[in-house]
Amino acid sequence: METDFQPKRAHFNHVKDTSSMNMSSSPSETHQGTEQKQEAVSTFTKLRAKLSFDRMVAMGAKMGMPNPLFLCADRAAKATIHINGKDYINFSTYDYLDINTHPEITAAVTEAARVFGTSAGASRLVGGERTPHHLLEEAIAKFMGTEDCIVYVSGHATNVSTIGFLFGPRDLILYDQLSHNSLAQGARLSGATKFPFQHNSCDDLERLLEAKRKDYKQCVFSMDGNIPDVPRLIELKKKYNCMLMIDEAHSLGILGEHGGGIREYFNVDPGDVDLWMSTLSKTLCGCGGYIAGHRGIIQYLKYGSPGFVFSVGMPPVIAVACLTALKIMEREPERVKKLQHISRYFLEYARSKGLDTGESQGYAIVPIITGESMFTGFLATQLLKRGIYVMPIAFPAVKEGEARLRFFLSAAQTEENCRTAIDAIIEEIPHVRQILEKYKAEHPQTAGE
């Protein structure tokens, strides 16, 4: 049986307006229900965020700028990505070690689907536990050097559910100001008192610990992003009797000689960190996330963490895919070396051309900071026209004035492709600036919104 995986184009004007559909046998009830629905829709369309979004779309349309988001690829993304019949140089996905679609993974997943099907069928706590879950958690714990591990079906939910469950109103959470949204959401959900500290600044973190720690029953601080000073963090954890959580979603398989992440990079005792978090969607080519750490904490999470207890278990086929990818990563450290080389090459070439790469250290993700959100979006569109696919990242994901093109590097990428992309940016910047200046002159009332 053939399966058609070709994307079907969706248009907003094809969405049915159901406000006038007769859902009741009573005409008066139907009329009243319609009025309520129309009032709710009207209220939504007047929200400030919705109006801002509408203005952005309108400005893009006036400038002839197509939406660079939600473009649908019809096959796996590698060094190139295939969209609407055309190949683009791909800097938009994080298959860092070029393991996705590896024949071993494909074969293992095929067999797992035959044996286990495609769903766990229930929460793991009450009937959804499958052999691949155990094998994956055991393998990750062994790789990380920890006592135990728990895997969640979502990387975002891993942080939100873990932090939200473990901490409460009597606790203190200190987090890097550039932490991922999931860390901030988890802190908010917990009800704990929370304070951000300056990005990667252990000095600012200690200032907060000195001032705040004594007032709270329990304290945790978390780090992610650029390579933090983990040995110093461990010192602070012990000095102030805190818990330490490290999110290394973008360091597993990237840092260290064998891809062991921050732990291998600094050669620290994994037991000195209470909660090691990472995702399974990047170097391990699946989806979900994990927490690795002390057995007591992990077991507590398995019996109470809402994102684990009240969610269906990870599909067994995904667990098998991640387990197989981990084995390949451990067996083929040359993939890690290739990723590290191409990342440094991209960073050094970009800087040699005078581009702003921020605090990037050349590990898998390199930003090209361009400033204004509209400028960045239009620059991404111009690059797309030239066959280069890279995502614009703008407010609120980053601060106003710090919009950027975010380049994901992978072991599949080439030096030639890196040069092509960077040279294209240099050529397009003055062109995009001219287009924006013209637009602002013609639309002075909307250009600054």
Task: Identify the function of each model-found stretch.
Residues 69, 336-347, 351-387, 397, ...:
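Conserved PLP-binding catalytic core of the aspartate aminotransferase-like
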Residues 2-39, 45-116, 242:
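N-terminal "arm"/small-domain region of PLP-dependent enzymes with the aminotransferase-like
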Residues 195, 199-246:
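Active-site phosphate-binding strand-loop segment of PLP-dependent enzymes
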Residues 169, 176-217, 334:
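PLP-dependent aminotransferase-class I/II
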